[in-house]
Amino acid sequence: MKLSEELIYRGFKAETTIENPEDLDNRQSKKFYWGADPSADSLTIGNLAAIMMCACFVRHGYEPYLLVGGATGQIGDPKENGERDLKSLEEVEHNKKCIREQVETVIRNAVSRLAPSRPSLRGSGAHSAPVVADGLETAYSNHSLTMVDNLEWFSKINYLSFLREIGKNFSMTQLLDRQFVQNRIGEGGSGISYAEFSYTLIQGYDFLHLYREYGVDLQLCGADQYGNCTSGIHMIKRLENADADVWSTPLVIDPVTGRKFGKSEGNAIWLAASDNGSGNYTSVYDFYQFWMNQPDAAVENLLKIYTLLGKEEIEEILKKHAEHPELRLAQKALARGVTAVVHGAGSAETVENLSETLFSKETDFSEFTEDELTEFAAYLPVIAKGTLLVDALVNTGLAESKKKAREFIAQGAISINGTKVQEDLAVNQTAIIKKGKNKFAIVK
């Protein structure tokens, strides 16, 4: 399958300046960049869709550049309904490091089609990158990921020089016509700061700089960034008399809530698997379960976007799934595939086995050994023996508050080693606490 065919098949096409997608197959220059602002110390599955698109380009011989916005991250991408909180310089620096690790790991895993399965993986979080495949395909080894930070050049730019070269050649009319600007400055809007208003100029200059320094003439982005990205095209045309392009991918919409997958929407699924103090993480187990719980109506598109499975493989999985939907074969393939790309093939295999064990009707929770519970503890929240059940539920995240914890207990939604409990008590033995159908914690 050619690049143009794969992009369309997987749904990686929204607005673009490229009239004929087939032009990507024989493009003379094969360098692109994708940017991420360090507004958090972890990316989300919303970002992951764009990264998977980038990996698709790399598999077809394109050279990738990752721009981590140390400069733009200090301002914040303008929102539709209000100004973002400014991050401290220390936060921005920390977030840049974490994002770099995540993007490189995902692209390398996605390009290499993953290494053979490994027994398990511990501590894959914001600082410790997930398993990276041993044997990288030629596409990646020939074009390793080049990481750049726009703070490197913006820290050296004179403000007046920037206004003379860029500000003088940029139309305010284009900015004022942007929908987010209209929403912010219109009646009932929150207004917009000069810093936010300048964001699109800064992002456009990034494209110009990468064109001048590296010959990058293609930018990839999410559909919500398309307007900002075209600013760079205008600058390159005006100042270098050269052509450049933007290719965007649609935002992925949660089929249950109707909202986009992303950290601004309050339903974020993070790529980091352990907390680094910010709370921006999703455990490998919860990450796997998120994909397992996707509805049948959404799973085909998600398999195309988020896994490395080919067209024939996806069609075969969907055929078998239609024959026996109760087995949830499509959801299992989705959960296994995405978890492997983000957290490594070993983690995907381990958490899949863990899930099957926890959900099996034949499992006797009281018979787990200390070693088995230690293995589970790498993927499930852990609480010390002797903790009161109400406190255990709150401290492991199974309940939002003590009031909620008591309600769950009274409703019979809590069990210890498979036995329902209806009163608060100290959990003194090694055990597995279960809430509802799919939430677990370890007591040890």
Where are these regions (language model features)?
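Positively charged, low-complexity intrinsically disordered leader regions
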Residues: 1-33
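Divalent-metal (Mg2+/Mn2+/Ca2+)-assisted nucleotide/phosphate chemistry catalytic cores
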Residues: 10, 88-89, 95, 108-111, ...
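N-terminal catalytic cores of NTP/NDP-binding nucleotidyl/phosphoryl-transfer enzymes
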Residues: 21-78, 219-223
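Active-site-proximal loop->helix
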Residues: 73-95, 102
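Short acidic, glycine/serine/threonine-rich loops at helix termini
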Residues: 76-80, 157-163, 257-265
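Intrinsic disorder/low-complexity segments
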Residues: 112-142
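Conserved nucleotide- and phosphate/pyrophosphate-binding catalytic cores
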Residues: 235-444
